[in-house]
């Protein structure tokens, strides 16, 4: 299985500043011109919500302050400017092969 390692596990950012979350895969999740890495946001008591698909594509309805980048094994989620409602947990997930796996999560806090 492909292991996804997220960092940091928790992050405190001031309102209006930038939050950067990293995800490293144990092997490449890129193939055929695509990077099969996705980012989710999970609020307490709710299922994960897709934010970014195929590394850098913004899901419909997601604010443009969210962006994704990366290829191969290293990926980044950026949130800028951070808003109060963004203080939840974020996960990366790959779909390069079965089974799809998730990173361990990053909890974003506002300071």
From Swiss-Prot:
It comes from the Eukaryota. SMART domains: IG, IGv. One of its GO terms (biological process) is immune response. Residues 54-60 are annotated as: Complementarity-determining-2. InterPro entries: Ig-like_dom (IPR007110), Ig-like_dom_sf (IPR036179), Ig-like_fold (IPR013783), Ig_sub (IPR003599), Ig_V-set (IPR013106), IgV_Light_Chain (IPR050150). The keyword Disulfide bond applies. Residues 1-23 are annotated as: Framework-1. Residues 24-38 are annotated as: Complementarity-determining-1. Residues 39-53 are annotated as: Framework-2. One of its GO terms (cellular component) is immunoglobulin complex. SUPFAM superfamilies: Immunoglobulin. The keyword Disulfide bond applies. Residues 102-111 are annotated as: Framework-4. Residues 61-92 are annotated as: Framework-3. Residues 93-101 are annotated as: Complementarity-determining-3. Keywords: Adaptive immunity, Disulfide bond, Immunity, Immunoglobulin. Disulfide bonds join 23-92. PANTHER family: IMMUNOGLOBULIN LIGHT CHAIN. This is Ig kappa chain V-III region PC 7940. It comes from Mus musculus (Mouse).
């Amino acid at each position: 299985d492909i292991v996804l390692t997220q960092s940091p596990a928790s992050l405190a950012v001031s309102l209006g500043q930038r939050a950067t979350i990293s995800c490293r895969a144990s092997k490449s999740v890129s193939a055929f011109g695509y990077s099969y890495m996705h980012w989710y946001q999970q609020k307490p008591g709710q299922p994960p919500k897709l934010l970014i698909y195929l590394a850098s594509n913004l899901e419909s309805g997601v604010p443009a302050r969210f962006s994704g980048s990366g290829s191969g094994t290293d990926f980044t989620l950026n949130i800028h400017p951070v808003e109060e409602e963004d203080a939840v947990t974020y996960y990366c997930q790959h779909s390069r092969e079965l089974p799809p796996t998730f990173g361990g999560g990053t909890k974003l806090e506002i300071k």
